[in-house]
């Protein structure tokens, strides 16, 4: 990565090489207070993370993304591989079950699958902001964050696409 940035007092790794489509999120939360989406690592700013949207046809991915954005249908995954780990951000607690996100775009890409559009293959990832108080992290893997509260603690704000080189 080589870039040393922070958002919400957590590492921020920009999605270099990805096409970004911004969502209209300004003034949509917190009675119009946009501090959560700040870019100065200031108090009240939320962390940046990525969420792979799974495999499937482009039309299926659009439906899934729409559900995640509009209906807030983030759901815990099946495996929950880190649920029993010690939580690095909340000493004395375990991570627990929840929605997996990552501060690493490459990790999210591994969970995004691909879709074909006009004969080209693309990966799709959601860029989200996450309430830093809601993040749980396994002490032995900084690549995975878990949010085990409500989906109000995860706010999508960009859709990312990248053409895969076959």
Task: Give residue spans per PLM region.
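Short connector loops at helix/strand junctions that flank enzyme active sites
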Residues: 45, 94-96
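A short, exposed loop/beta-hairpin motif centered on an aromatic-Gly-Thr core
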Residues: 89, 96-100
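Active-site and NAD+-binding cores of ADP-ribose-processing enzymes
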Residues: 7-10, 54-59, 63-84, 109-166
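Structured, beta-strand-rich domain cores
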Residues: 102, 108-109
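Short, flexible, solvent-exposed loop/turn segments with mixed acidic/basic and small polar residues
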Residues: 38-40, 83-91
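Intrinsically disordered, low-complexity terminal and linker regions
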Residues: 1-67, 71-72, 78, 123
